[in-house]
Regions:
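Short conserved segment of the HATPase_c
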Residues: 96-108
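Conserved catalytic submotifs in the C-terminal HATPase_c
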Residues: 9-13, 34-44
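A conserved beta-strand-to-alpha-helix junction within the catalytic ATP-binding
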Residues: 9-24
Length: 168
């Protein structure tokens, strides 16, 4: 990722399939949580690396589980907003302090309140690298009423070299 040499295996993919794949892979860890999934009906196919996006969703979901009370609700939502598709993972866990928010996607950064929870501090940095490679953006924010929201957005517009192929 750091060298900028990440090779994306781009193809048309459905975000519903990406989310479903992440849910299947996390089933063992999420079975004691109430997982709520809302996939927007109007999502277009996107030109992306589905396996890497599944890794991003899986990491965000695993973090939600790691920082939430067993049995609590975790939501995964997708939506279309102008020229972006957005995937959000919402939890009712520990939440994120305003002080930690700007650093969450830095390599090796661990929020203070999470010192007793295992992790390397690389997961969110890797997610950021994957999303950046797709010309997207990733962020986190505090959730009203407690917990946090981690989200990423990807453009639905085609890379210039693919625009002609779709019209053929």
């Amino acid at each position: 990722l750091e060298s900028g040499m990440l090779q994306l295996k781009l193809d048309w993919c459905d975000l519903e399939d990406v989310v479903s794949g992440a849910l299947r892979r996390s089933k063992e860890h999420t079975q004691s949580y109430k997982i709520k999934v809302e996939i927007a009906d109007d999502l277009p196919l996107i030109y992306a690396d589905a396996a890497l996006l599944e890794h991003v969703v899986l990491n965000l979901l695993d973090n939600a589980v790691k920082y939430s009370v067993e049995g609590s609700e975790i939501e995964i939502q997708t939506c279309l907003d102008d020229s972006e598709v957005i995937v959000m993972v919402k939890d009712l866990g520990l939440g994120v302090t305003a002080k930690d928010l700007p650093h969450l996607f830095d390599k090796f950064y661990r929020a203070r309140q999470t010192e007793k929870i295992s992790g390397t501090g690389l997961g969110l940095a890797i997610c950021k690298g994957i999303v950046d490679a797709h010309r997207g953006r990733i962020w986190a924010k505090q959730r009203t009423g407690g917990g946090s929201i981690f989200a990423f957005a990807l453009p639905v517009t085609l890379p210039e070299e693919k625009a002609g192929e779709k019209n053929d």
